[in-house]
Protein backbone atom coordinates (compact mmCIF):
# COMPACT_ATOMS: atom_id res chain seq x y z
CA UNK A 1 0.00 0.00 0.00
CA UNK A 2 1.56 3.30 -1.11
CA UNK A 3 -0.04 5.24 1.77
CA UNK A 4 1.62 2.92 4.30
CA UNK A 5 4.98 3.34 2.52
CA UNK A 6 4.71 7.13 2.59
CA UNK A 7 3.75 7.18 6.28
CA UNK A 8 6.67 4.88 7.11
CA UNK A 9 9.08 7.17 5.24
CA UNK A 10 7.53 10.24 6.89
CA UNK A 11 8.12 8.75 10.35
CA UNK A 12 11.77 8.05 9.53
CA UNK A 13 12.25 11.60 8.23
CA UNK A 14 10.60 13.01 11.33
CA UNK A 15 13.00 11.23 13.65
CA UNK A 16 15.94 12.78 11.77
CA UNK A 17 14.43 16.28 11.76
CA UNK A 18 13.58 16.14 15.45
CA UNK A 19 17.24 15.39 16.22
CA UNK A 20 18.49 18.08 13.85
CA UNK A 21 15.96 20.74 14.90
CA UNK A 22 14.40 19.80 18.26
CA UNK A 23 10.86 20.98 19.01
CA UNK A 24 12.28 23.39 21.61
CA UNK A 25 14.31 25.06 18.84
CA UNK A 26 11.28 25.30 16.60
CA UNK A 27 9.22 26.64 19.49
CA UNK A 28 11.78 29.38 20.16
CA UNK A 29 11.77 30.37 16.51
CA UNK A 30 8.02 30.96 16.79
CA UNK A 31 8.78 33.95 19.01
CA UNK A 32 10.49 35.58 16.02
CA UNK A 33 8.11 34.20 13.43
CA UNK A 34 7.02 36.95 11.00
CA UNK A 35 4.16 34.80 9.66
CA UNK A 36 0.77 35.26 11.29
CA UNK A 37 -1.78 32.74 9.96
CA UNK A 38 -4.31 34.40 7.67
CA UNK A 39 -8.06 33.64 7.73
CA UNK A 40 -8.97 30.60 5.65
CA UNK A 41 -12.66 29.77 6.12
CA UNK A 42 -13.97 33.05 4.71
CA UNK A 43 -11.60 32.71 1.75
CA UNK A 44 -12.83 29.21 0.86
CA UNK A 45 -16.56 29.65 1.45
CA UNK A 46 -18.54 29.89 -1.80
CA UNK A 47 -20.17 33.31 -2.24
CA UNK A 48 -22.52 34.74 -4.89
CA UNK A 49 -19.78 36.99 -6.31
CA UNK A 50 -17.12 34.21 -6.24
CA UNK A 51 -18.92 30.85 -6.18
CA UNK A 52 -16.07 28.60 -7.35
CA UNK A 53 -13.20 28.95 -4.89
CA UNK A 54 -9.93 27.45 -6.12
CA UNK A 55 -7.10 25.97 -4.05
CA UNK A 56 -4.41 25.75 -6.73
CA UNK A 57 -1.61 23.29 -6.10
CA UNK A 58 2.14 23.66 -6.50
CA UNK A 59 3.18 20.09 -7.25
CA UNK A 60 6.19 18.84 -9.19
CA UNK A 61 5.50 15.08 -9.07
CA UNK A 62 3.24 12.37 -7.70
CA UNK A 63 3.64 8.64 -6.94
CA UNK A 64 1.18 7.66 -9.67
CA UNK A 65 2.33 10.03 -12.46
CA UNK A 66 6.00 10.65 -11.72
CA UNK A 67 7.31 14.12 -12.66
CA UNK A 68 4.37 16.25 -13.79
CA UNK A 69 6.18 19.52 -14.52
CA UNK A 70 9.84 19.68 -15.56
CA UNK A 71 10.18 23.49 -15.58
CA UNK A 72 9.24 23.73 -11.92
CA UNK A 73 9.58 27.15 -10.28
CA UNK A 74 7.27 27.27 -7.23
CA UNK A 75 7.23 31.07 -6.93
CA UNK A 76 6.58 31.64 -10.65
CA UNK A 77 3.76 29.07 -10.53
CA UNK A 78 2.25 30.74 -7.45
CA UNK A 79 2.33 34.12 -9.20
CA UNK A 80 0.46 32.58 -12.15
CA UNK A 81 -2.15 31.27 -9.74
CA UNK A 82 -2.55 34.74 -8.24
CA UNK A 83 -2.90 36.24 -11.72
CA UNK A 84 -5.57 33.66 -12.59
CA UNK A 85 -7.67 34.43 -9.53
CA UNK A 86 -6.96 31.40 -7.33
CA UNK A 87 -8.17 31.87 -3.75
CA UNK A 88 -5.53 29.79 -1.93
CA UNK A 89 -2.43 27.78 -2.79
CA UNK A 90 -1.64 24.21 -1.80
CA UNK A 91 2.08 23.54 -1.46
CA UNK A 92 3.39 19.96 -1.56
CA UNK A 93 6.15 19.61 1.02
CA UNK A 94 6.62 15.80 0.91
CA UNK A 95 10.10 15.24 -0.60
CA UNK A 96 10.30 11.59 -1.67
CA UNK A 97 7.14 10.84 -3.61
CA UNK A 98 6.05 14.38 -4.60
CA UNK A 99 9.48 16.09 -4.80
CA UNK A 100 8.21 18.84 -2.53
CA UNK A 101 10.08 20.93 0.03
CA UNK A 102 8.95 22.81 3.11
CA UNK A 103 11.04 25.83 2.03
CA UNK A 104 8.58 26.34 -0.84
CA UNK A 105 6.08 27.67 1.72
CA UNK A 106 8.43 30.46 2.81
CA UNK A 107 9.48 31.28 -0.75
CA UNK A 108 5.88 31.57 -1.95
CA UNK A 109 4.69 33.43 1.15
CA UNK A 110 7.09 36.27 0.36
CA UNK A 111 5.49 36.92 -3.02
CA UNK A 112 1.78 36.07 -2.97
CA UNK A 113 -0.98 37.18 -0.56
CA UNK A 114 -3.27 34.13 -0.66
CA UNK A 115 -3.46 31.63 2.23
CA UNK A 116 -1.08 28.67 1.92
CA UNK A 117 -1.89 25.03 2.65
CA UNK A 118 0.90 22.73 3.77
CA UNK A 119 0.06 19.53 1.89
CA UNK A 120 1.90 16.63 3.42
CA UNK A 121 1.34 13.47 5.43
CA UNK A 122 0.99 15.02 8.86
CA UNK A 123 1.12 12.55 11.74
CA UNK A 124 2.87 14.55 14.49
CA UNK A 125 2.49 17.92 16.26
CA UNK A 126 6.07 18.69 15.26
CA UNK A 127 4.94 19.01 11.62
CA UNK A 128 2.26 21.51 12.64
CA UNK A 129 4.82 23.75 14.35
CA UNK A 130 7.03 23.40 11.26
CA UNK A 131 4.12 24.46 9.05
CA UNK A 132 3.58 27.61 11.10
CA UNK A 133 7.29 28.50 11.20
CA UNK A 134 7.62 28.14 7.42
CA UNK A 135 4.54 30.21 6.59
CA UNK A 136 1.49 27.94 6.24
CA UNK A 137 -1.98 29.23 7.10
CA UNK A 138 -3.66 25.83 7.07
CA UNK A 139 -2.60 22.21 6.90
CA UNK A 140 -3.85 18.96 5.40
CA UNK A 141 -4.90 16.24 7.83
CA UNK A 142 -5.70 12.92 6.13
CA UNK A 143 -8.33 10.99 8.09
CA UNK A 144 -7.26 7.71 6.47
CA UNK A 145 -3.74 8.08 7.89
CA UNK A 146 -4.83 8.84 11.47
CA UNK A 147 -6.86 7.25 14.23
CA UNK A 148 -9.94 9.09 15.47
CA UNK A 149 -8.01 10.19 18.59
CA UNK A 150 -4.93 11.28 16.61
CA UNK A 151 -7.01 13.34 14.19
CA UNK A 152 -8.82 15.13 17.01
CA UNK A 153 -5.58 15.90 18.86
CA UNK A 154 -3.81 17.19 15.75
CA UNK A 155 -6.80 19.30 14.74
CA UNK A 156 -7.05 20.88 18.18
CA UNK A 157 -3.31 21.61 18.21
CA UNK A 158 -3.61 23.18 14.76
CA UNK A 159 -6.23 25.57 16.14
CA UNK A 160 -4.08 26.18 19.23
CA UNK A 161 -1.32 27.41 16.89
CA UNK A 162 -3.79 29.74 15.15
CA UNK A 163 -3.99 27.76 11.92
CA UNK A 164 -6.87 25.89 10.28
CA UNK A 165 -7.00 22.39 8.80
CA UNK A 166 -8.43 20.80 5.69
CA UNK A 167 -9.50 17.34 6.87
CA UNK A 168 -9.43 14.95 3.93
CA UNK A 169 -11.87 12.04 3.66
CA UNK A 170 -12.53 9.30 1.11
CA UNK A 171 -15.36 7.28 2.64
CA UNK A 172 -17.97 7.22 5.42
CA UNK A 173 -15.50 5.92 8.02
CA UNK A 174 -13.22 8.91 7.32
CA UNK A 175 -16.20 11.27 7.52
CA UNK A 176 -17.16 9.93 10.95
CA UNK A 177 -13.60 10.65 12.14
CA UNK A 178 -13.76 14.19 10.71
CA UNK A 179 -17.11 14.93 12.36
CA UNK A 180 -15.92 13.48 15.69
CA UNK A 181 -12.80 15.68 15.54
CA UNK A 182 -14.91 18.78 14.86
CA UNK A 183 -13.45 19.62 11.44
CA UNK A 184 -14.62 22.93 9.95
CA UNK A 185 -13.27 22.25 6.46
CA UNK A 186 -13.82 18.81 4.93
CA UNK A 187 -12.14 17.74 1.70
CA UNK A 188 -13.54 14.85 -0.34
CA UNK A 189 -10.69 13.21 -2.24
CA UNK A 190 -12.06 11.40 -5.29
CA UNK A 191 -8.81 9.43 -5.48
CA UNK A 192 -8.23 6.42 -3.25
CA UNK A 193 -4.77 6.98 -1.73
CA UNK A 194 -4.19 3.24 -1.38
CA UNK A 195 -5.10 2.14 -4.93
CA UNK A 196 -5.05 5.50 -6.83
CA UNK A 197 -8.45 4.61 -8.32
CA UNK A 198 -10.72 7.59 -9.00
CA UNK A 199 -14.41 7.78 -8.10
CA UNK A 200 -15.91 11.08 -9.23
CA UNK A 201 -19.29 10.11 -7.73
CA UNK A 202 -17.91 10.30 -4.18
CA UNK A 203 -18.90 13.93 -3.62
CA UNK A 204 -22.49 13.18 -4.56
CA UNK A 205 -22.53 10.21 -2.15
CA UNK A 206 -20.83 11.86 0.83
CA UNK A 207 -22.04 15.48 0.77
CA UNK A 208 -25.57 14.62 2.05
CA UNK A 209 -23.93 13.05 5.12
CA UNK A 210 -21.88 16.15 6.01
CA UNK A 211 -23.41 18.38 8.73
CA UNK A 212 -24.57 21.86 7.73
CA UNK A 213 -22.14 24.72 8.20
CA UNK A 214 -19.02 22.89 7.05
CA UNK A 215 -16.90 24.16 4.18
CA UNK A 216 -16.65 21.41 1.57
CA UNK A 217 -13.67 21.00 -0.75
CA UNK A 218 -13.58 18.64 -3.74
CA UNK A 219 -10.16 17.14 -4.52
CA UNK A 220 -8.71 15.22 -7.51
CA UNK A 221 -9.97 14.63 -11.03
CA UNK A 222 -11.24 18.17 -11.63
CA UNK A 223 -10.31 19.70 -14.98
CA UNK A 224 -13.26 21.68 -16.36
CA UNK A 225 -15.58 24.56 -15.53
CA UNK A 226 -18.56 22.27 -16.13
CA UNK A 227 -17.40 19.89 -13.37
CA UNK A 228 -16.94 22.80 -10.98
CA UNK A 229 -20.45 24.10 -11.68
CA UNK A 230 -22.05 20.68 -11.11
CA UNK A 231 -20.10 20.02 -7.90
CA UNK A 232 -20.96 23.49 -6.62
CA UNK A 233 -24.66 22.68 -7.12
CA UNK A 234 -24.14 19.66 -4.84
CA UNK A 235 -22.71 21.91 -2.13
CA UNK A 236 -18.98 22.11 -2.85
CA UNK A 237 -17.40 25.45 -1.89
CA UNK A 238 -13.83 25.02 -3.11
CA UNK A 239 -11.85 22.88 -5.51
CA UNK A 240 -8.31 21.65 -4.96
CA UNK A 241 -6.69 21.29 -8.38
CA UNK A 242 -3.06 20.42 -9.05
CA UNK A 243 -2.09 18.15 -11.91
CA UNK A 244 -4.40 19.82 -14.46
CA UNK A 245 -2.82 23.22 -13.80
CA UNK A 246 0.72 21.83 -13.64
CA UNK A 247 0.43 20.50 -17.21
CA UNK A 248 -0.51 23.89 -18.72
CA UNK A 249 1.68 26.40 -20.56
CA UNK A 250 -0.52 29.34 -19.57
CA UNK A 251 -1.54 28.51 -16.01
CA UNK A 252 -3.29 31.81 -15.24
CA UNK A 253 -5.63 31.48 -18.24
CA UNK A 254 -6.60 27.92 -17.32
CA UNK A 255 -7.38 28.98 -13.73
CA UNK A 256 -9.66 31.68 -15.16
CA UNK A 257 -11.38 29.13 -17.40
CA UNK A 258 -12.02 26.76 -14.50
CA UNK A 259 -13.57 29.65 -12.55
CA UNK A 260 -15.61 30.71 -15.58
CA UNK A 261 -13.80 34.03 -15.93
CA UNK A 262 -12.42 33.40 -19.44
Swiss-Prot record:
Q: Which GO terms describe its biological process?
A: L-tryptophan biosynthetic process
Return the EC number: 4.1.1.48
- Give the intrachain disulfide bonds: none
User: Which SUPFAM superfamilies does the entry mention?
Assistant: Ribulose-phoshate binding barrel (SSF51366)
Annotated signal sequence is none
Which domain of life does the UniProt lineage start with? Bacteria
Q: In which pathway does it act?
A: Amino-acid biosynthesis; L-tryptophan biosynthesis; L-tryptophan from chorismate: step 4/5
Protein's name according to its UniProt entry: Indole-3-glycerol phosphate synthase
Per UniProt, what is the name of the gene that codes for the protein in this document? trpC
Amino acid sequence: MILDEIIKKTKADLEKRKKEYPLEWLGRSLAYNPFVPRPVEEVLKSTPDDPYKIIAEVKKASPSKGVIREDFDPVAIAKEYEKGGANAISVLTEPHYFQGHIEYLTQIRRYVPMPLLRKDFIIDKYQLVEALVYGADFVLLIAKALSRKELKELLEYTWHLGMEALVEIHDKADLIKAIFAGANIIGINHRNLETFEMDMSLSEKLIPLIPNGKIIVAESGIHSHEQVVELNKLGVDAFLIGEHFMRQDNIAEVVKKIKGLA
